[in-house]
């Protein structure tokens, strides 16, 4: 029998303490110097949203150039087992995946192996959807949502659980007719990005999932991410919920999409932070350049008109925040909602993930608030407060009940118990009292609807 000495015991104990300390440190990341108050304001805002909207888990990361300024999880990764969410909780990040697919194509473009403006048949000879127009479909169009292809592939899409291959998904698109002439209009298309990813699979004779792991995720250093679930991913994947207007809550389905390149990335916010660091280092990763600076600049430049703060670049949605160009993408897939934003000029970024279906209005609001705080902090300004709401006074709520018409918008306001509901032909959302008046405030919509009073008249405003 091996003798276990007191010295061995203390060595063993030291190792355990060290490992446990590392584990605790890796779960959440404390704010760096100067970001302490920013983190406190965000903690308050996130806890408010979780409590008021009955959410499972939210994780957020802030990026300041090549540093994680703060990262933390809130709520429960697994509510039944009471496992708390943290910064390394894994989420399905939906359409944020598109940015990675497009970057993989751009790696090959800068090597001269792919031309974005060649007809797609140059690379996929059998991909011939019905195109009654003279303008051919190209990769550039598909990556900036200007191809005219239908939004969803006929198979392997968000609404089917067939779990077919990427090849079969792309083949299902071929019998379809273009919705618009290529380049004429912006039409968001998951089908198009499925074709983009399939192009990589065909040209380089490697399954898309393996290709992306080697050429994108590993090069960025996203060691806790993947385009298909594995044991490591599943062990940290948040338990996600679906919900309905009649208050039913049920577990989100876990089937894989056939259109993998458009929405199948699994990642924690700490790995999304590494992606944003690539954007701020002009394409340089931990093992060299993932993408060249000039190629990255093309990705964040407007395609087919528009400006640096409007429309799409290659993959990236372009907008404005605080006078700066803001780039990013949202993501929505069964049970999960994500928002990623970056401001390249000042190298600030944020990613927010939620494990409740169609809660994108919340991840978007929180992400924009995070950027507001970071900008105010940078400029030594007073940090703004988060917009919070409360139930509408019962007497006022009763006076709001009725049918509203504004242009093509038809809506009803109903009082249900203590809650005031706005019901349109496409959504139902609570109306609540804020400091600036009555606004929509629910999982599905935040502030897009307002009630304005002019004299004795009430009007419904849709922003």
Regions found by a protein language model. Give the residues of each.
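Bacterial N-terminal signal peptides that target proteins for export
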Residues: 1-9
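Short coil/turn segments at secondary-structure boundaries
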Residues: 61-62, 154-159, 184-186, 228-231, ...
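Active-site-proximal loop and beta-strand segments within enzyme catalytic domains
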Residues: 29, 47, 76-190, 197, ...
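Catalytic-loop motifs flanking and including active-site residues across diverse enzymes
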Residues: 10, 97-101, 138, 192-195, ...
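Catalytic loop of the DD-peptidase/beta-lactamase superfamily, centered on the K-T-G motif
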Residues: 22-72, 201-206, 210-214, 218, ...
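Bacterial N-terminal signal peptides
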Residues: 10-20
